[in-house]
A protein has these predicted regions:
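Short juxta-domain linker segments that transition from a proline/glycine-rich
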Residues: 1-186
Length: 186
């Protein structure tokens, strides 16, 4: 892993720790019910849980134009659930240290009270949305924190879980039933 990726992870671990300490000072925080709630579920069922939690049903999406509103909507809904979301294209605010999209697209830092999703904003908006949905799948699955897509997986990449997260993200983005109902080959 590059120094830029490691520094980005460390910075966000500090942010997450600060937020966890803040929540503890406010009172005894309850574990967020969605964290780990999809473990053992098939991708379609998990996608339904995420879609409902993020209020991202197909019927609601027509209001979300242009595409940047989709990203904003998903981020806001995840934060309303109690999670943290960071979209950034550089290490901290250092414009001389741009993040390499080929190295990673996003990562999740798991926490029962403050899960954090980081998305590499050097990707297209559509790519960022898919990466966000993929990282949401990690949060709903629970388990270890980790880096998604790119080169060195920091020795924490389970390809079966990564495939499952991709399937969940794809199902949230384009539900199979909606695709079947609206696809007309003639």
């Amino acid at each position: 892993a590059s120094g830029d990726l490691l520094d980005t992870i460390y910075l966000n671990q500090r942010r997450q720790s600060w937020y966890e300490e803040y929540l503890i000072k406010l009172g005894d925080p309850e574990p967020l019910p969605f964290v780990g709630s999809a473990q053992g579920l098939d991708a379609t069922t998990a996608a339904t849980l995420i879609t409902e939690a993020l209020d991202y049903q197909v019927t609601n999406r027509t209001k979300l134009r242009p595409i940047s509103k989709v990203r904003s909507h998903l981020m806001t809904k995840f934060e309303e659930l109690g999670g943290l979301v960071i979209f950034n294209s550089m290490v901290g605010n250092n414009t001389k240290r741009m993040l390499d999209l080929e190295e990673f697209r996003g990562f999740t830092l798991q926490s029962p009270i403050a899960p954090l999703i980081f998305i590499n904003a050097n990707d297209t908006v559509n790519g960022q949305i898919f990466s966000f949905l993929h990282e949401c799948a990690h949060v709903w699955h629970g388990g270890n924190s980790g880096v998604s897509a790119g080169g060195d997986p920091l020795d924490n990449r389970d390809t079966q879980i990564e495939r499952w997260c991709d399937q969940v993200a794809a199902e949230v983005a384009v539900p199979t039933t909606d695709l079947r109902d609206n696809f007309n080959p003639h």
